[in-house]
């Protein structure tokens, strides 16, 4: 995630020449104070104050410059005074970077004894932002609105969350997804229009022959394998059979070789997300389990069975959640525990669940896999952390993409499962199992999802709004009749 260090958000403060030089100097000084403070809070992305926007020409120039500056990932607009919105028409019609309308003011409280008309003329966000907001709404332009004093914790958190979404948007627009093999045969939801995805999101999806990956695996040197195996030993609880001298030690070495070769291929090609499928493994000794788990933990996106849409979404949520403590993973609804009024979903996959969500030190073991026709693969075994969580997916409906996010509560495992050989999570659906499941299915939600313990639906809605794709949020207030109506309305709204 080194690319995050070079990103910046531009802070554009609106006013007008009507107020005179002295007032505008004070506006600029106040903007500098706010910028310094916010940057001192160690934001996810640095904020860069730009010259005051006081004329249509200034505003047009700023917006065009933001478009052309590669490292600028978004614009914060604040109307310190009244800034007539017709001045913003030229700039806003051209601005193609994410926009945040910052509805704040310098002083938290009214200076009751000192307030006069000079103060009133200078501190006009309350109506200046309404004028600006009208014009943005007139353009039907998506934006985020943050309301509150710039020193409040809630405002800082909202800005941080917005910046995290910006980083994911930027990354999607530069993302390359590598596919090894095609989709799992006869599966529908993992298919999709890769050309339309590149037009809509910006990422490219291309396929590569297994022989190319095999060549990369075969060129890995023994010294690097030895070093990686030592890293395994330091990071995980190794089963006895995988320890030095164990009967399955060679399989662990083979897995390390696959990991190094896979990573080398991805890095050489600039790929930050990838897919594979158990039906296309020619030349590879085992289905990559441990290698995929570890690469996801390093921030790569992944989708099993050729699921490139989920691979790209895993990467997006990895970027959004960089530095946060709880993790996210490729996931699949696998099976249920159907106690009355206490239904629980067991989420997992054949192998590929990211250890960033693990609640303890994972066990590294090799177990049989009765699918794929290859040698038994290495994998990390663990249970997920508990807490508020989301499951998200993007599906291709033929004429548009739809993102679906479901609120959930990840829970501790009810009982030990000594024979379950995969990483896994348990969760309860909102508003309950019945409605939550129906809502996902009615919305066309995939059987693959991105499970996150850090990123919530509001952030994902902002992500979807920027890309102008449909967003369905399943939550504690979801009612099926209302959802069915929303799905009907969206058929018209997103044509």
Curated annotation (Swiss-Prot):
NCBIfam families: PRK02929.1. Signal peptide: none annotated. This is L-arabinose isomerase. It comes from the Bacteria. It comes from Mannheimia succiniciproducens (strain KCTC 0769BP / MBEL55E). Binds 1 Mn(2+) ion per subunit. It catalyses: beta-L-arabinopyranose = L-ribulose. The gene is araA. Pathway: Carbohydrate degradation; L-arabinose degradation via L-ribulose; D-xylulose 5-phosphate from L-arabinose (bacterial route): step 1/3. CDD domains: L-arabinose_isomerase (cd03557). GO terms for cellular component: cytosol. Catalyzes the conversion of L-arabinose to L-ribulose. Belongs to the arabinose isomerase family. GO terms for biological process: L-arabinose catabolic process to xylulose 5-phosphate.
């Amino acid at each position: 995630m080194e690319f995050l260090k070079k990103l910046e958000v531009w802070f554009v403060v609106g006013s007008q020449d009507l107020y005179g030089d002295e007032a505008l100097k004070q506006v600029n000084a106040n903007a500098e104070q706010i910028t310094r403070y916010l940057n001192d809070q160690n934001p996810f992305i640095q904020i860069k104050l730009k010259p005051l926007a006081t004329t249509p020409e200034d505003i047009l120039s700023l917006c065009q410059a933001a478009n052309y500056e590669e490292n600028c990932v978004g614009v914060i607009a604040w109307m310190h005074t009244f800034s007539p919105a017709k001045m913003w028409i030229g700039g806003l019609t051209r601005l193609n970077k994410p926009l945040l309308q910052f509805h704040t003011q310098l002083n938290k409280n009214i200076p009751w004894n000192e307030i006069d008309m000079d103060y009133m003329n200078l501190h006009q966000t309350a109506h200046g932002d309404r004028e600006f907001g009208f014009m943005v709404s007139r353009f039907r332009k998506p934006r985020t609105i943050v309301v509150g004093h710039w020193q409040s914790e809630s405002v800082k958190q909202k800005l941080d969350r917005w910046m995290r979404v910006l980083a994911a948007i930027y990354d999607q627009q530069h993302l390359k997804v590598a596919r090894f093999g095609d989709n799992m045969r006869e599966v529908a939801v993992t298919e999709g229009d890769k050309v339309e995805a590149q037009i809509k999101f910006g990422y490219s999806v291309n396929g590569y022959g297994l022989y190319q990956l095999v060549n990369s695996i075969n060129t890995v040197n023994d010294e690097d394998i030895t070093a990686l195996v030592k890293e395994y030993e330091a990071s995980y609880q190794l089963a006895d059979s995988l320890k030095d001298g164990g009967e399955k030690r060679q399989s662990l070495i083979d897995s390390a070789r696959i990991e190094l070769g896979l990573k080398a291929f991805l890095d050489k090609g600039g790929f930050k997300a990838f897919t594979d499928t158990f039906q296309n493994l020619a030349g590879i000794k085992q289905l990559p389990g441990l290698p995929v788990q570890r690469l996801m933990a390093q921030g790569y996106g992944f989708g099993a069975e050729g699921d490139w849409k989920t691979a790209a979404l895993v990467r997006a949520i990895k970027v959004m959640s960089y530095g946060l403590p709880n993790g996210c993973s490729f996931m699949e609804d696998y099976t249920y525990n159907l106690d009355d009024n206490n239904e629980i979903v067991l989420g997992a996959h054949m192998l590929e669940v990211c250890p960033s969500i693990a609640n303890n030190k994972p066990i590294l073991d090799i177990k049989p896999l009765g699918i794929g026709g290859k040698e038994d693969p290495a994998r990390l075994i663990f249970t997920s952390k508990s807490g508020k969580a989301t499951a998200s997916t993007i599906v291709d409906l033929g004429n548009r993409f739809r993102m679906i996010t479901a609120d959930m509560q990840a829970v501790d495992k009810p009982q030990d499962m000594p024979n379950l050989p995969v990483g896994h999570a348990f969760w309860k659906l909102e508003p309950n199992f019945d409605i939550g499941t129906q809502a996902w299915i009615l919305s066309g939600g995939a059987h693959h999802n991105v499970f996150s313990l850090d990123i919530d639906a509001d952030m994902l809605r902002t992500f979807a709004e920027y890309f102008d794709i449909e967003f369905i949020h399943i939550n504690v207030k979801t009612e099926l009749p209302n959802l069915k109506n929303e799905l009907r309305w969206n058929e018209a709204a997103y044509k």
